[in-house]
């Protein structure tokens, strides 16, 4: 955990059969630390699969970096460096027939970002604040 309260991981990913499983496990681990509910974990894994399957096609050499940051209620991925307009191309490539665009449907925010030298895609998912452990989830019966 860093000083800002984030759990972070930096991965270098090359397109191939291990990209999705490795990235998925890292996302799963950090999502658990962030208190991610199971339904949103499934959404995060859909995003992971889309990034692992397609992002390398939009880089100069088939490799990308993925920076994952998680804290209670939020998971954020920064994907890149991508080639010029690669972030928009990556977003467009996530469209599936009959389903629509996976990234747009399940992420709370997707935003191409540019530094002076590179382009990145920021993908953010937010979810409700988890209940503290040991909290009462059912109403207590009235005392007689």
Walk through the language-model features, giving the residues of each.
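Bergerat-fold GHKL ATPase/HATPase_c domain
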Residues: 1-46, 133-144
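Conserved beta-strand-loop-beta-strand hairpin that lines the nucleotide-binding pocket
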Residues: 1-10, 54-144
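Conserved ATP-binding N-box helix of the HATPase_c
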Residues: 37-63
């Amino acid at each position: 955990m860093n000083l800002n309260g984030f759990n972070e991981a930096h991965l270098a990913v090359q397109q191939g059969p291990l990209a999705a499983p490795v990235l998925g496990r890292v996302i799963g681990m950090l999502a658990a630390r962030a208190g991610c509910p199971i339904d949103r974990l499934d959404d995060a894994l859909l995003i992971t699969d889309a990034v692992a399957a397609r992002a390398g096609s939009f880089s100069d050499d088939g490799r990308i970096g993925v920076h994952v940051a998680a804290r209670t209620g939020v998971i954020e991925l920064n994907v890149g460096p991508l080639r010029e307009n690669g972030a928009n191309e990556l977003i467009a490539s996530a469209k599936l027939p009959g389903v629509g665009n996976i990234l747009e449907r399940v992420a709370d925010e997707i935003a191409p970002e540019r530094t002076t030298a590179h382009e990145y895609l920021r993908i953010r998912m937010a979810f409700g604040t988890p209940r503290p452990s040991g909290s009462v989830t059912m109403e207590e019966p009235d005392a007689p």
